[in-house]
Amino acid sequence: MNEIQTHIHGVSIRRNFVENLPYNPQLKKLLPGKRKARILSEVLFWQQVRARTFHNIDFDRQRIIGNYIVDFYVKTLGLIIEIDGSSHDEKEVYDGIRQTYLESLGLKVFRIIDFDVKHNLTLVMKELENYIISNYGI
């Protein structure tokens, strides 16, 4: 049975709750600093999704999953949203390892470029809608 989470443009979106995710409590002490860092692209994105303003979907900010802190997490969809800054080869390798691990838990990862959030947020939100529809729509 597919429990409906919400609707986007008339398309029913099914829940995909991933249970028993690993959690490293040692990372909890890092959360206040990350939240206070106020990275502009994260603040702009958060303004679009906080308090269920994006299709009544509940987003968490700075969520610990395993040994990682993800930018945003939608528990009911098992969806991670990561905002990527400027690319460096080392960062890309790290992001790839991290994404492989997160996907091995049954999660999906939607990546956004920092520049796009700052300069074309409307398009970013449309791309997120399309991603959710294509991955969770029924």
Spans of features found by a protein language model:
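Solvent-exposed, charged helical/coil patches
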Residues: M1-N56, N135-I138
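Basic, amphipathic alpha-helical patches used to engage nucleic acids or provide basic targeting signals
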Residues: K34-R38, R61-Y131
